């Protein structure tokens, strides 16, 4: 049974892209693997956060994890800040990382571009991410392809530590799903769908009302050709919608293309909206049951307890290898 770790920031709503790129596959992975699913709230504070809203976002994300099918009897669901070893190992991994390689991270360059003042946390985000993963002897990390560079750095840092001190860390493998790994914006289909996009029409939230979902899909940018065909380079808009349809329906892109041969985008978009609405309806129902229930707190308490046991043990191995731990007389 392989160990799997994955984390999502509680920085606003969860999009269709988050669900298809990560959460949907989690429900399958938990049946065959030892899974740790972490709400990485310490990563969220690398940008300014309102304390009240952040607290709400953490709880909302936890409820969505369970509503999407995460079973606390099979997987460990917890909040990053409730396991102190994450921040402790994050500092240690900063001492292993080099400033140059951190500055080369694409996400850092994108977020720091054009800013007069750049929080140090944006630069040191990857070592903390590495710590998140390495604390649990993680073997597989399911991520969207936009996180591939950070994962490669995690592997580099783990190998560097193992060579410099001793073999402590398991080198994690990257798993990127074939379909739905990168859901694009509905308004600018050459960009990733993002919860931070200022245009609300660009993304679908997992908590959007059915009518809102229908409006967003029907207004999604396509092209003037009117043929439902996958062509990422020349038809990025319709290709993105085909990816979403395929991910929710279980049908291949080719099967969907055949279904809409001779039909226009209007029919396709209308049907896609219904597919999405029906797929996320039970998730929304379960979310509403959980969000204010003591059951959710019990799940998070239990998850933090288990994560702390495992993480503390690994942190002690790291400290022993580095000579940080005190030998008692």
Swiss-Prot record:
It is found in: Cytoplasm. GO terms for molecular function: ATP binding; tryptophan-tRNA ligase activity. Keywords: Aminoacyl-tRNA synthetase, ATP-binding, Cytoplasm, Ligase, Nucleotide-binding, Protein biosynthesis. A motif ('KMSKS' region) lies at residues 192-196. It is an enzyme of class 6 (ligase). It comes from the Bacteria. GO terms for biological process: tryptophanyl-tRNA aminoacylation. InterPro entries: aa-tRNA-synth_I_CS (IPR001412), aa-tRNA-synth_Ic (IPR002305), Rossmann-like_a/b/a_fold (IPR014729), Trp-tRNA-ligase (IPR002306), Trp-tRNA-ligase_bac-type (IPR024109), Trp-tRNA_synthetase (IPR050203). ATP binds at residues 9-11, 17-18, 144-146, 183, 192-196. It catalyses: tRNA(Trp) + L-tryptophan + ATP = L-tryptophyl-tRNA(Trp) + AMP + diphosphate + H(+). A motif ('HIGH' region) lies at residues 10-18. Homodimer. Catalyzes the attachment of tryptophan to tRNA(Trp). Belongs to the class-I aminoacyl-tRNA synthetase family. This is Tryptophan--tRNA ligase. The lineage of its organism: Bacteria, Bacillati, Bacillota, Bacilli, Bacillales.
């Amino acid at each position: 049974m392989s160990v799997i770790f994955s984390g999502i920031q509680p920085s606003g709503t969860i999009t269709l892209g988050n669900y298809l790129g990560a959460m949907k596959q989690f429900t399958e992975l938990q049946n065959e693997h030892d899974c740790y699913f972490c709400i990485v709230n310490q990563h969220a504070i690398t940008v300014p956060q309102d304390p009240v809203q952040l607290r709400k976002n953490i709880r909302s994300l936890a409820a969505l994890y369970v509503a999407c099918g995460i079973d606390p009897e099979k997987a460990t669901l917890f909040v990053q800040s409730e396991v102190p070893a994450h921040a402790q190992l994050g500092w240690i991994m900063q001492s292993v990382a080099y400033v140059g390689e951190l500055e080369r991270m694409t996400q850092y360059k994108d977020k720091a571009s054009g800013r007069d003042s750049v929080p140090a946390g944006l630069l040191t985000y990857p070592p903390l991410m590495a710590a998140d993963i390495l604390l649990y002897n993680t073997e597989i990390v399911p991520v969207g392809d936009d996180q591939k560079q950070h994962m490669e750095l995690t592997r580099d840092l783990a190998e560097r530590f193992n060579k410099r001190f001793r073999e402590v860390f398991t080198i994690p493998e990257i798993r990127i799903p074939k379909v739905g790994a990168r859901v694009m914006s509905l308004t600018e289909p050459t960009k990733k769908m993002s919860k931070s996009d200022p245009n609300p029409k660009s993304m679908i939230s997992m908590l959007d009302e059915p009518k809102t979902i229908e409006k967003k899909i029907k207004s999604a940018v396509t092209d003037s050709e009117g043929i439902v065909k996958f062509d990422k380079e020349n038809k990025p808009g319709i290709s993105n919608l085909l990816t979403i349809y395929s991910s929710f329906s279980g049908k291949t892109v080719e099967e969907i293309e055949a279904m809409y041969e001779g039909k226009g985008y209007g029919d396709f978009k209308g049907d896609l909206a219904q597919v999405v609405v029906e797929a996320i309806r039970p998730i929304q129902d379960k979310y509403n049951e959980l969000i204010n229930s003591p059951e959710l707190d019990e799940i998070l308490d239990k998850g933090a307890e288990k994560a702390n046991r495992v993480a503390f043990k690994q942190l002690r191995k790291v400290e022993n290898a580095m000579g940080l731990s005190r030998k008692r007389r």
